[in-house]
Each structure stands twice: as C-alpha cells, then as structure tokens.
C-alpha cells in the first residue's frame, strides 16, 4: 500500500497521473451499443475544474463519443490523477461535490437505492427525501488504496464487496470473516452442546468422589 501511495504522491507533484488503468477497464467492459439501447437509466457526477461546480450527467446527456470521457472524469481523483478534458473544459472526480449521489438517483426516479459507501475521500451530502428506502453496503475489510486499479487489488476488492453485499441481504454470515449461511449457528450449537456435555461429565465424576472430612483447629 505504501508503494502505491508513494507512486500517486509523486504523480500529484507532477500534475497527476494518467487514468490509463481505468481507461483500459472501461474499454473492456463498456458495450456502447447495449449501454445506449438499455432501458435502464444511468447517471454520474463530475466536478468542473477549477471552479468546482458540479456537473450531474444522465445517460440522455451522453453520446457515444463522450460517454467514456465523462466516466473517466467522474473518477479523476485530482491531484493524484490528471483532470479529464472534455471539449474545452476540465473535469475531476465527482466526490468533490458528492461522493455518494443518492439525491441525484432519487431525482432521476429511483424509489429504492442501494448505496455503496467505500468511505473514500470526498463530500457526502444529506439525503433530502427520507421516504425512499436506502440500503447501505459498507466494506468490513481494508480494500487497499482507492487509487489503485491494479488487477490484484481489484480482484480482492470485488471479492470483499460480493461478500459484504451477501451479508447485507442475509445470504452469508459473518462480519469481517465470511461464513456460509447458517454455519455460524450450527457451529455455535455444536460447541455449546459439546461444552455442556463435558461440564455434565465433570460434575457427575465429582459427585462420585469420596472426600475425607478435615477439621481445622486453632491449636
């Protein structure tokens, strides 16, 4: 972790690193044809630099030419990463305005929100509409540096995130450690029964022992 933080600290001193790692991820997973044809809406938050004015972008605002750029911009954690240029403007991470844009999701029509709170650096705004059901998912383990897009860190974070989500929805048991559903209760009952068995065995043996009465005197 120290090596990664050192790398990004040096990058910050040079004006920020390029988002090449995330750019490659987007190229790999983003199918623009399916994305724009899907009836599922999409929104992101980025921040204009240097004014720090928020820019809330919906799928209808995006084009095939700028979709990737806005996705990169929303994750351009300045000063570790360079701002992303779109047209004549520069944009940085949306966390400078709202790191968990629940209000934006509600404004787009969401009647239930699943919010993943990574506890990363950034602003978190108070939810205005308290009538919407919100389920929070928070990591129970150290995910490593949020600046890292290396495969090993990503795989580890995905695994932890899956486990944390399954625990929230009662599909797995545990807190920091993860167990199959019901295994904790079964193991507890097994150990409890075993403990009681040995206690009863010990007491039954003690009851059969013959003790010699000893009288103590002051002389």
Q: Where do the protein language model's features map onto the residues?
A:
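Patatin-like phospholipase
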Residues: 1-219
């Amino acid at each position: 972790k120290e090596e990664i933080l050192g790398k990004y600290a040096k990058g910050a001193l040079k004006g920020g690193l390029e988002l090449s790692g995330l750019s490659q991820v987007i190229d790999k997973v983003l199918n623009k044809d399916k994305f724009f044809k899907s009836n599922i809406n999409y929104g992101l938050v980025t921040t204009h630099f240097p004014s720090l004015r928020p820019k809330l972008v919906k799928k209808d605002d995006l084009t095939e030419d700028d979709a990737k750029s806005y996705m990169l911009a929303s994750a351009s954690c300045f000063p570790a990463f360079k701002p992303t240029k779109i047209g004549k403007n520069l944009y940085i991470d949306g966390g400078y305005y709202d790191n968990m844009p629940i209000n934006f999701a509600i404004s787009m029509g969401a009647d239930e929100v699943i919010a993943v709170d990574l506890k990363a650096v950034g602003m978190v705004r108070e939810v205005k509409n308290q009538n919407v059901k919100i389920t929070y998912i928070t990591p129970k383990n150290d995910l490593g540096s949020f600046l890292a897009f290396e495969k090993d860190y990503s795989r580890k974070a995905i695994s932890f995130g899956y486990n944390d989500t399954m625990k929230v929805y009662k599909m797995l048991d545990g807190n920091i450690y993860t167990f199959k559903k019901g295994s904790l209760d079964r193991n507890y009952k097994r150990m409890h029964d075993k403990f009681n068995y040995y206690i009863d065995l010990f007491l039954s043996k003690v009851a059969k022992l013959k003790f010699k009465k000893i009288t103590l005197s002051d002389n």
